[in-house]
């Protein structure tokens, strides 16, 4: 089961990180929520294999350290989500379906 495609309406915004919204719940270090609105990454599903970072032609993602998280200790953070060109490359290569892209 991948990211909830309705997280933008089903979850509360609980904060901001690197210029994008974070949707809860969040209970670090084990529950980190979904980061981003245009390009959402479920940090609790992300296994940090780097597929999305390598596939993105406009460098939407940067590595972010998440020590102590059970899935992986780093995440693909959508820090440049405003640059997204909606090619869906990241969505198509993510092995755990942790990414959802929706134009504003």
Curated annotation (Swiss-Prot):
GO molecular-function term, one example from the UniProt record: 3 iron, 4 sulfur cluster binding
Cofactor binding note: Binds 1 [3Fe-4S] cluster.
Keyword vocabulary terms for this entry: 3Fe-4S, 4Fe-4S, Electron transport, Iron, Iron-sulfur, Metal-binding, Methylation, Repeat, Transport, Zinc
Entry-linked Pfam families: Fer4_10
Stored InterPro entries: 4Fe4S_Fe-S-bd, 4Fe4S_Fe_S_CS, Fd_Zn-bd, Fe-S_Ferredoxin
Residue positions binding [4Fe-4S] cluster: 56, 84, 87, 90
Residue segments, region N-terminal extension: 2-37
Domain 4Fe-4S ferredoxin-type: 38-66, 75-104
Residues modified as N6-methyllysine: 30
Top-level division of the source organism's lineage: Archaea
Cofactors that this protein relies on: [3Fe-4S] cluster; [4Fe-4S] cluster; Zn(2+)
Residues reported to bind [3Fe-4S] cluster: 46, 52, 94
Residues making up the signal peptide according to the UniProt record: none
TM region(s), chain numbering: none
List of residues binding Zn(2+): 17, 20, 35, 77
Keyword Metal-binding: yes
PANTHER family tied to this protein: ADENYLYLSULFATE REDUCTASE, BETA SUBUNIT, L-ASPARTATE SEMIALDEHYDE SULFURTRANSFERASE IRON-SULFUR SUBUNIT
Main function: Ferredoxins are iron-sulfur proteins that transfer electrons in a wide variety of metabolic reactions.
Protein name: Zinc-containing ferredoxin-1
Species for this entry: Sulfurisphaera tokodaii (strain DSM 16993 / JCM 10545 / NBRC 100140 / 7) (Sulfolobus tokodaii)
